[in-house]
């Protein structure tokens, strides 16, 4: 979760000040692990019987009491996620209580349950934004990846219902081997619906509560992931801005004086951002579950202080910090740990990703020169 990706200038100012003071201004609540779909790459989804073997859901009253502690600690932005958050009992009660506290709310949903009634609710009590994940461009892709063929039509319908009511919607797309061919179609669909598309081409090998290992065969190989990432930017950016991005990226790689950081967490995680899972453990981010504190037992402020302090102590390897490709690399401490089982490990997948991405940037720059001639 990176709130900065979609933050306005005003929000960025808030976030940066909170980061400097280690105020937990933004967070995410994973309300439950249940979902009506069963996507191959999901690291959260459990069946009801699997969930009950691990524990019970927190009640709406527990979440409200915790949110009151968050409010006192300075939390302003909250993401509600799951699983499928609309399956959470008393979701509307929790949502309205958080809204009445002044929280600025965003929702992650697969959209399949979002009918006219839900759309009317969100039109009356608007969130900041609703992020809807689109897993493919047709029913066949939904069947292959999510084992839920009707999901495509249901999701597109949900997007239309929300846009008809002028709600802010963003399409998220997790690109895998089973739906990579759909991405250009998803981008076109987003344009037709008047909704921006965010595609995630790098899939961290997370497992979390699921009892079986990550299916490495689902994610793209690093070269394909890098190619799709650059293709996405080319589709989304105006040609002059894309050229500028290519030139600046190459310059940063080849400029030894360009800052490469000290290897410590450079995003918001543990600095001013947190994630709380359905069990009630607070993490710096959804992918850093090795650093945690039981928030319902310790209280929010104590759990935040414990996790934030621990997060500031971890760092990447010196090899990663000194690598010339670091300015375009997607490695972070969470990715390093999930790829290698060590914060200071060298994540080979991302090394290959960055190498190929750099060669693609060089090819783009060469094409600019040939066009000019």
Would you name each region that the model predicts?
Residues 69-72, 124, 192, 317, ...:
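Alpha-helix termination/capping residues and helix-transition junctions
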Residues 49, 87, 115, 139, ...:
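Generic structural signal for helix capping and beta-alpha/helix-loop junctions
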Residues 52-56, 143, 310:
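A short acidic, glycine-rich active-site loop
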Residues 28, 195, 208, 213-214, ...:
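Accessory C-terminal segments flanking Radical SAM cores
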Residues 58, 89, 150, 178-181, ...:
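Residue-level signal for the nucleotide or nucleotide-sugar donor/cofactor binding architecture
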Residues 2-129, 228:
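Conserved alpha-helical substructure of the radical SAM core
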Residues 66-82, 348-373:
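Short Fe-S-cluster ligation motifs
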Residues 124-128, 133-135, 140-269, 275-279, ...:
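Radical SAM enzyme [4Fe-4S]-AdoMet core and its adjacent flexible, acidic
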């Amino acid at each position: 979760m990176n709130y900065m990706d979609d933050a306005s200038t005003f929000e960025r100012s808030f976030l940066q000040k909170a980061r400097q003071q280690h105020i937990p201004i933004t967070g995410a609540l994973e309300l439950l692990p249940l979902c009506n779909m069963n996507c191959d790459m999901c690291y959260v989804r459990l069946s009801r019987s699997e969930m009950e073997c691990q524990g019970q859901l927190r009640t709406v009253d527990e979440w409200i009491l915790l949110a009151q502690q968050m409010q006192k600690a300075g939390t302003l932005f909250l993401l509600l996620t799951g699983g499928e958050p609309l399956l959470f009992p008393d979701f509307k009660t929790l949502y309205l209580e958080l809204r009445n506290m002044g929280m600025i709310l965003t929702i992650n949903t697969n959209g399949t349950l979002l009918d006219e009634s839900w759309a009317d609710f969100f039109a009356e009590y608007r969130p900041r934004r609703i992020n809807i994940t689109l897993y493919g461009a047709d029913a066949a892709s939904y069947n292959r990846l999510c084992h839920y063929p009707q999901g495509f039509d249901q999701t597109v319908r949900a997007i239309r219902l929300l846009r008809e009511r002028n709600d802010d919607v963003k399409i998220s797309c997790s690109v895998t081997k089973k739906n990579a061919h759909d991405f250009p179609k998803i981008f076109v669909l987003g344009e037709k619906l008047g909704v921006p598309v965010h595609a995630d081409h790098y899939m961290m090998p997370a497992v979390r509560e699921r009892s079986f290992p990550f299916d490495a065969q689902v994610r793209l190989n690093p070269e394909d992931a890098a190619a799709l990432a650059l293709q996405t930017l080319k589709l989304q950016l105006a040609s002059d801005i894309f050229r500028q991005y290519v030139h600046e990226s190459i310059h940063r790689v080849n400029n030894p004086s360009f800052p490469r950081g000290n290897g410590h967490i450079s995003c918001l995680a543990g600095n001013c951002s947190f994630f709380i899972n359905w069990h009630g453990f607070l993490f710096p981010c959804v992918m850093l579950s090795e650093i945690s504190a039981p928030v319902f037992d310790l209280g929010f402020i104590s759990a935040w202080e414990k996790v934030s302090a621990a997060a500031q102590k971890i760092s990447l390897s010196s090899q990663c910090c000194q690598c010339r490709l670091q300015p375009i690399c997607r490695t972070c401490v969470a990715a390093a740990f999930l790829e290698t089982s060590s914060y200071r490990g060298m994540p080979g997948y991302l090394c290959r990703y960055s190498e190929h991405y750099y060669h693609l940037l060089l090819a783009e720059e060469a094409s600019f020169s040939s066009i000019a001639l």
